[in-house]
């Protein structure tokens, strides 16, 4: 039997607040997502450096070119298939363009294959999940081939970033809700209905009712867009019946995009809420040769600090691929303030923290006619809700934010004290995403949603 070594960055610890409740059923069937290295990595890095520097002579890659030149090599995929066969695992899907292989097998088979112990945990908010501690182990011939092994542990990785606005209180400062069309007018959204384009939306739970969507778009006087549900890793459109839960996020995402660009096709990718499911969903959208989304919207995320190094690297690599293809990825920056709900200290939200993502924050505004009269950062939510943002602890400052670094240095000198740059890769740009109305489960709601966006990079 080949000697196995820990996969760098794969170490897991016990989730804070979790309780071990026993071993996993060794006969339980699970799926595991394996991500492989990229061919011609140095050449790809050189291309990305030109893109990040804003070189006007660089054109986005086509999906065909990306797959041929920068996908996983046939030899690397063959090595993973041989490893799977040696351990009785089944190859469900091998995607050279996405550099991924999806494996299926029993808990016992995966424990033996990767030398891990899978156990059941109970968490007071996340519920029951399959977890592991320590590192994933791979043999010598896969050590430089495999970048990540995800799905052995299926703890919930993200939460939806939206909040239902509480009822109006006349004693407080005047508040008003806006329809997406009103917001588009206030922010001078460009003309056009998105015809010929596709917007991908990533969802990690819940679902939508087509009747709710039809009613909502009819109330706005706009045609209902074409909405497609795409199943990823056996997840699907499954409404929970609770508009205050993930259904509210799913419905709101579709309604905002559909109202502003009704001519665009909307592909909603439903995936399990785990690091494997999240990454695979975005990867499937990026490499979707049928729907070909040119914009991907993500309203889910979690503190950067709870991701393993391998999952951060794998996810960021997918987002980098999107940038190479000219696909704009927008993600909510969070709604739990500077802590991102992670307890003590400052934390930023991922995937908004990636340098290849357009991070979207929220504001509160007042308007008169077609003009914004007052706008401030959203910072007054119930139970401590506030817009997220900050400085990434995982990604260094990209070239296109050097101007921010200089502004911060000048500000520090003018105050004769040090100052931290308020923008990093964690918030490459903060976009307003203000209160707007939506309809879910036959009920109208006004939501403070920090992730309403659609548009070209």
Q: What are the functions of these language-model segments?
A:
Residues 2-94, 102, 107-362, 386-452, ...:
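Substrate-binding/charge-relay-adjacent region of secreted/lumenal peptidase catalytic domains
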Residues 381:
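Extended ligand-binding clefts on enzyme/binding-domain cores
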Residues 361, 374-376:
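Surface-exposed, charged/polar loop-rich segments
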Residues 366-373:
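Short acidic, Gly/Pro-enriched loop/turn segments at secondary-structure junctions
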